[in-house]
A protein has these predicted regions:
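Beta-strand-centric surfaces of beta-sandwich/beta-rich domains
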Residues: 1-151
Length: 151
């Protein structure tokens, strides 16, 4: 890895009640690994009685979904390298097959989650594979996600 740290914001994404939605995905280039350094989730819930949102970080075996391309921003603008990964957000058609679930969190929609993985324990993605963050809310919610990725 070239120590190219990228910040990838999704903007606000609407979640429908009781429907899983992929809010962020990253695909590694064919011969390069990616490392997910951290993830931040911020909800706009207003009810204290809403059910926590299930957040799943999973491998995707077949994408096949329709999404918006997310534009990564370099942490250090002096680095000449260009981001090689493919980053997507706000899927309107879900990926067809999800693989192994790497992590699951339950987060109350009046709060958020700021998680930076411990050194050497970051989820790694081998070349040509995809990882995604899928959320399921019992009530309709709005979320903004920021991912920090190392290429």
């Amino acid at each position: 890895m070239a120590d190219l740290i990228l910040n990838i914001p999704t903007g606000e994404v609407s979640l429908s009640a009781a429907t899983a939605k992929t809010v962020f995905s990253m695909t590694a280039p064919a011969n390069q690994r990616l490392k997910l350094k951290g993830v931040e989730l911020f909800f706009k819930g207003v009810s204290a009685t809403d059910t926590p949102v299930k957040c799943e970080l999973s491998l995707v075996t077949t994408d096949g979904g329709t999404a918006t391309t997310a534009t990564p921003a370099k942490n250090d603008n002096d680095m000449a390298e260009t981001a090689q990964g493919v980053y997507k957000t706000n899927y309107s058609l879900e990926p067809s097959i999800y693989g192994a679930n790497l992590r699951t969190w339950e987060v109350h929609p009046q709060t958020g989650l700021v998680l930076y993985f411990p050194l050497h324990d970051e989820p790694r993605l081998k070349g040509g594979t995809e990882m995604a963050l899928r959320l399921t809310a019992a009530q309709a919610q709005t979320v903004a996600v920021n991912a920090v990725v190392e290429e």
